[in-house]
């Protein structure tokens, strides 16, 4: 996700294409809502599976989508190229394939995505590894700070600076690789990302 944000930063900065800005904002919002831990830093990762099934939290059954979306289904299926066979083990990973939509269609898709997000949030989430790793947090915070500048997003900038200050407090005496239950001595990567 961090490298994807960095790539979107570059695409938007070079092209000023609002499509890239939207994808950038969606990804940053996902990271900020799903990866923050109790220390107001970022956890490490999510497991791939929930309820013992790989990808279950993120994939959609064709019939489930059709029943959930009703009359909104056809446009959504067109945008995400949904099939009964699916694109991952009989289910559909929502991969955008059609982005030439009218303003009204974009608005409808946006509302539909919110419905599905609410529906997905009712599912059992994958296990979250909430430990804060220095290298990962430094890399992410640097990338988010750049995103705030590229998109001129003052809220993102202030939230990122707040997280940087929190991380600085943890690093003030000694740099560790990760914090929480146990402190693990730093690796070279931790020093490199902290210095950048």
Where in this protein do the model-derived segments appear?
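Glycan-recognition and catalytic cores of secretory/periplasmic carbohydrate-active enzymes
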Residues: 1-196
């Amino acid at each position: 996700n961090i490298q994807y944000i960095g790539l979107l930063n570059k695409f938007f900065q070079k092209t000023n294409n609002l499509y890239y800005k939207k994808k950038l904002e969606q990804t940053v919002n996902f990271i900020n809502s799903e990866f923050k831990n109790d220390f107001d830093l970022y956890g490490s990762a999510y497991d791939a599976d929930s309820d013992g099934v790989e990808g279950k939290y993120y994939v959609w059954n064709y019939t489930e989508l059709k029943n959930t979306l009703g009359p909104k289904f056809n446009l959504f299926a067109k945008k995400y190229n949904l099939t009964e066979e699916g694109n991952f083990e009989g289910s559909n990973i929502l991969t955008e394939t059609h982005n030439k939509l009218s303003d009204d269609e974009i608005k409808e898709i946006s509302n539909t995505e919110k419905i599905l997000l609410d529906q997905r949030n009712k599912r059992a989430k994958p296990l979250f590894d909430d430990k804060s790793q220095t290298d990962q947090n430094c890399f992410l915070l640097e990338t988010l700070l750049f995103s705030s500048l590229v998109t001129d997003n003052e809220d993102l900038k202030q939230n990122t600076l707040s997280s940087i200050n929190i991380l600085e407090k943890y690093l003030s005496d000694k740099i560790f690789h990760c914090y929480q239950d146990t402190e693990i001595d730093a690796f070279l990567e931790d020093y490199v990302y902290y210095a950048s």
